[in-house]
Amino acid sequence: MYFYFFNKYNLKILEKKLLIIFKYNISFKILHELLYLGYEYSFLYNYSLNIKDFSNFIYLLILYKNKINNIYNNKYYEIKNNYINVFLNNYYYLKVINKIQGILNNNLYNKINPIYSNLFLFFNNKIKIKYSQLQQLIGYKGYISNIKGMIYEKPVINNYINELNIYEYILSCYGSKKGIIDTALKTADSGYLTKRLINITSNFIIKELNCKSPFILKYILNMDIYGNIILPLNILRFKILQNNILNLNNGTFIYTKNTYITKYILNKLLNLYNRRNIYLNIKSVYLCNIYNNICNTCLNYKQLYKYNLGQHIGVISSEAISEPSTQMVLRTFHASSILKDKFNFNKYLIYKIYLYKLNINKIFKLIINFKKYINIKFNLIFLMNKILYNYNNILFEYKYILQNQYIKCNFIYNSISKNFKYNLNNIIIKYLNNVIKYYNYSNIQLLIKNIHNKWILYNIYTYYLYYYHIKFYNLYNKGIILNNNNNKYNVIYFLINYFNLFSNYYYKIYNNNYNFINSNYYFKMNFILKNFNNIQILNKLFYVNNIFIYYKYEKKLFIYLNIINNIIIKKYLNFYKYTYNKLFFIKKYNNFLYLYEIFKYNWYKYLLLNNKYNLYIIYNNYIKYLYKYNININLYFIKNLFYNNNNFIHNHIIYKNNYYIYNNNMNLYQYNKNILINNNLLYNKLFYNYINNNIYNLYLNDITIGLQSINIIFENKNIKDNIFFISNNIYVIFYIKYYNYLNNIIYIYNICNKYNINHYKYKLNFYSYIFEDISSILYSGYSLHTEFYSINKNLKYYFRFLLKSINIYQATKSSYIYVYNILIESILKQYSYQNIYLPSIYFELIIKKMLSCIKIISNNFKIFKYNDIISLQLINIINYSLNLNKHYIYKYEPIILGITKSILANSGFLTNISFQNTFKIISLNILNNKIDWLIDIKSKIILTDLLPVGNGWYRYLVN
């Protein structure tokens, strides 16, 4: 079944098509029929629901997260049965609505409740309501919270008609006071936001036709996190194309230069066969050469006239941005009865862990809920460095080691990479001759770069576009394959082939000669070879990476055979051996020889070409964060990337930073990060039943939308979070504070006692799909204030990376461009989730101001002091002059300024002392001379000067 999503632009296209194809009378009848359908729908039900109404409800996003982008990117959208049952033609949903409507139509509601309520008022008068309003109306009423958000135990039962008692009257005052104060404060915040936006953009007046800037931004089609091939619609819409697009099939031009980019054009480009070779060149406001202003060409936006000369585009954009924010204040529903979390009186099994460590004053105490994990097919548990499984009530343990190194020649810092979905059908476990073998079929994964230069990990077999780049190797070779043959694509392939994860082989040979051919990889091999004198190896049948090991009781030799140079290297036991980027070591236990192969992926140069950044966390198939620690020597630790699934996390992360070894324990404690890492911890586990019968741990929640996250992005606010580690051997705790709807969450991934057959797993109450949007610092209207994605750290690290190869100005400008698109998309999404669509040019003007200054980090100069905030173009001119005269130049670093700080940095002295922090500004400038050029709008108002407002420039309009 196909559905067409209409907006104003689509309706205009429909009218034109109808008039071209049909006559006026037929077109009139079709449009009139559509009008009747709309009226019939509006009178049939009181609900005005759209699929976009669910974008702000985090727990419904999982139902259509893989399909929602197709609504905006494709002309038609096929809704499958599982999605159509949820949103559009849900039989049970319509059945409930029909029952409610039938009760109202038959006047049964008056018999049930003769006192009119708000719900009856909405239904009886056919007032359109949204889902959030309906949620407020049908929720349990009467529970009141105090100023701290705690709910009182007794609700308000009566109303003003039936009279309130003194207890209920006092409680009702809380809600009245809260509604009045919230409305007043948020309206004031919205008005103050308008004032700040106009102050920051007041100087943007189009005075130049063309600045002759040679720089453009190139956009290509890429894969988003949902697997869709997309173009950045929000950024490209309302822009002007700067290049010709050629159809490679027939050699004709699809679109030519100076074409106005619309959604229809982007959809047509997405449907082309050779779309992967298409580049869209767009002029950018940030790349304009004019100091503290923009030209008409770089504005790249057509309004009413051919030229925008004289247009006060800064004030227009600020008003266009801030006016919807005022409307968002009116969308705050003071829902006294909407509970933030569900509560019940069921019994929960609580798992307490008390950790104690000698010589460390820090004691971790954590309480989590957990559920028992049961695998029906095979009782398998994936741990950090071993696999535990239960077979015939016997616990087996198998070890494997994978070394963590650096991804070669790539930058994926702070990206969130998505792995393929875990499928148990790909796992085969065979029991043959009391030998347990664990198999996994061939999997090919890749890292691709998306629009914002971020790496995304995907399974090749599910997305057809990248079949062109698959480079199949021998089935027995595995590792990272980097394809640099085509510079247009930055693609890394993880080729993981058919292999045996663990296996026990017991060879008993009694003849003198033995021919041994092995072409598989094993994480663990046990070889017992007895009574032999000669060993014959068939070199022709061996592959490059094959190994041959034998064990001799008398001399205890470990022999590694390399077929490349046909040299047999002999080493004693328990020695590490490097040969062609492969590391092996063996271990003797109970007359068995255990061979461990440490797979090296050559992940050096992976982050900023610096070995200081060595640690990253993979949890729920996402590369989340990288920590910066100095590593002086190599420390081999256990790592498994093969079997990351949604149920378990099994990456053993150990890094070295002034560690010491005592009683075979490696201990690490960082006081500033509150990180405690131990190999063998002394911990006590207590189990008890906890009855959740306390209503005081619940909080009431308002339905607030929009304005808070907009303020946070514009002001560049940061919320610092504590991040810990907990696992079986290394404890990882994530303590994450979210801005709006989630306060304190503790994630504990794996809880397992290897001496106990019962293994437990904590089921997350906040799933990982919240973090899927890797190109934005907010998701579904909520800001992500975690250290997983800190835009300021991202800017700083990228600047340091670029500084190694280019000069300081180029590194600063490039790093600003790097975060430019992220900030634009973040703020555009905040408005689009509220069904407010504005041209991106309005936001680009503000973000250009936010990214226009730097911070001085030099100490030996007199003009500018340390931590002074100066314009980037100004300091570049000064450094150029200093360099010509062979003087030391200023050292600086990029900084993202909020709109308030940007106003203070770009305004004169009079504006600053009348804006904010008057006493601080006067005290800082009391000993220094300060020159005010009186060029900002507030200085002109103070001095009653003429304001640069009006469309002027009449000669350009006439010509």
Curated annotation (Swiss-Prot):
Record keywords: Apicoplast, DNA-directed RNA polymerase, Metal-binding, Nucleotidyltransferase, Plastid, Transcription, Transferase, Zinc
Listed cofactors: Zn(2+)
SUPFAM superfamilies membership: beta and beta-prime subunits of DNA dependent RNA-polymerase (SSF64484)
Record's catalysed reaction(s): RNA(n) + a ribonucleoside 5'-triphosphate = RNA(n+1) + diphosphate
Family matches, as Gene3D superfamilies: 1.10.132.30, 1.10.150.390, 1.10.1790.20
Any one GO biological process: DNA-templated transcription
Annotated cofactor note: Binds 1 Zn(2+) ion per subunit.
Family to which the UniProt record says this protein belongs: Belongs to the RNA polymerase beta' chain family. RpoC2 subfamily.
Designated name of the protein: DNA-directed RNA polymerase subunit beta''
